[in-house]
A protein has these predicted regions:
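A short, acidic, amphipathic alpha-helical segment used as a generic capping/interface helix at domain edges
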Residues: 85, 309-326, 344-347
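Proline-aspartate-enriched helix->loop->beta-strand connector
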Residues: 94, 322, 326-331
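A charged, amphipathic alpha-helical module
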Residues: 1-31, 143, 151-279, 307, ...
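Acidic/His-rich segments in extracytoplasmic proteins that coordinate ligands and/or metal ions
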Residues: 80-153
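Redox- and metal-dependent alpha/beta enzyme cores, enriched for Fe-S-associated oxidoreductases
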Residues: 27, 38-56, 245-310, 314-319
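Peripheral docking tails and interdomain loops at the edges
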Residues: 3, 346-398
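An N-terminal, globular interaction/scaffold subdomain
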Residues: 34-89, 93-95, 100, 108-109
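Glycine/threonine-rich flexible loop motifs
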Residues: 104-108, 338-344
């Protein structure tokens, strides 16, 4: 297939957290607000003259300094952010808005405040107290946290407009990006998709890490380009799979999987599109902030939720996504030492295979994908096993 017009430009943008578009927005007087978790509503960080940046630390090398401050037994994603912060890579930030969801990430982000890692006198760090259940009481608590620890500090420190009208405008702009990426994602359902998982991963990551008002036109143009794009006559993939798990902020992971012969047709991981790129529908009978809060709590698929309906809902979602996108198997991945996904992938991969009949493989990995020969071998073996199952099905065997 012909390369997408903006693919190379987007790839270059993802090489740095402080990329040229972030620099442009800051030069225009806008405030860069960093976050790392789905539970920090992205849309709230794009209200008024603010824009959201989901923190990444691309091209990270040694983690010696962050390991000194934390531990060798902490996931590399958390340590990479701290390492980059110590290097001075996040001095463009106006605030860091975090959630008490992952204790490892909390320890990493606390150091931004303790070590004064951002050279900005007005810079502040805030943590939301997150509930473990979704009830009317927990929604009220979540709304209160968002108001007291996000909206009010932004208004008091930077004079940000956090009125209901400003929130509605932010939701409308957020939904436009979501509609574009959702429509692009529909092409992944085709028998011979006209977009690869790597390309979609790039587009989605850019929407998380760059000011949306500076990329929405290019995303819209990319959608039009894809509508006209013809897929390769002979598919370059051998099987289609879903990837489920913890943070994948490195598109090199998706590239590695696809080079092994498995086309990634659906993603259910942090930094992915499910959840993350659904439109937010405001309930006219509820306050705007409560509608936003309910959206994020109810759509979250984080394994920190232990309600029975939430646990079973995560399994059923993966099953339904595989059916909808015609995925033949599921790759469950977990960052090494990830406290939540370490439990989730073990049980979920068993349930998906033995209860739902969908082949799966479970792997743990380092944050940096480059040169990971062991992971490549695991994926290749999984691809071959799926091909064997296909042949057996065609021959009527088991």
């Amino acid at each position: 297939m012909k390369d997408l017009k903006y693919l190379y430009e987007f790839e270059k943008l993802l090489e740095s957290a402080n990329n040229p578009l972030v620099q442009q927005a800051c030069a225009e007087g806008k405030h860069a607000l960093a976050y790392t978790c789905y539970h920090m509503p992205e849309v709230l960080l794009n209200t008024g003259d603010c824009f959201s940046v989901r923190l990444r630390a691309p091209l990270t090398g040694s983690l010696d300094i962050s390991s000194y401050y934390m531990s060798n037994f902490i996931c590399d994603y958390c340590k990479s952010l701290l390492e980059r912060g110590i290097e001075g890579g996040y001095n463009f930030l106006s605030a860091l808005l975090a959630t008490e969801t992952c204790s490892e990430m909390n320890r990493a982000l606390e150091h931004f405040e303790l070590l004064h890692l951002v050279d900005n006198e007005q810079f502040f760090v805030t943590f939301l107290d997150m509930p473990f259940k979704v009830t009317d009481n927990t929604v009220r608590h979540y709304v209160d946290q968002l108001r007291r620890k996000v909206l009010e500090p932004l208004h008091e420190v930077y004079g940000v407009d956090v009125s209901d009208d400003a929130l509605r405008k932010a939701v409308a702009e957020h939904n436009e990006v979501c509609r574009i990426l959702t429509e692009i994602g529909q092409f992944r359902k085709e028998e011979n998709p006209r977009i690869t998982g790597y390309e979609y991963h790039i587009l989605n990551l850019v929407s998380y890490c760059c000011p949306k008002y500076l990329i929405v036109d290019k995303l819209r143009e990319t959608l039009e380009e894809l509508r006209r794009r013809e897929p390769d006559v002979k598919p370059r993939f051998r099987v289609k799979i879903a990837v489920v798990g913890s943070e994948i902020d490195d598109p090199g992971f998706t590239k590695l999987v696809e080079e092994a012969g498995a086309l990634v047709v659906v993603d259910r991981f942090c930094f992915g599109s499910t959840p993350g790129r659904e439109e937010i529908h405001l309930d006219p009978d509820l306050p705007v902030l409560e509608s936003i809060a309910r959206h994020y709590l109810t759509t979250s698929q984080c394994p920190r939720y232990m309600q029975r309906e939430k646990v079973e809902g995560r399994w059923q979602l993966v099953r339904d996504l595989c059916k909808e996108y015609h995925a033949q198997g599921v790759l469950y991945e977990q960052l090494k030492f990830c406290e939540y996904w370490g439990y989730e992938r073990a049980l979920a991969s068993h349930v998906i295979t033995h209860d739902y009949g969908i082949p799966s493989v479970a792997v743990d990995r380092q944050n940096a994908t480059g040169g990971n020969g062991q992971l490549r071998t695991r994926v290749q073996a999984f691809v071959e096993s799926l091909e064997i199952k296909q042949l057996q099905a065609q021959r009527g065997g088991k």
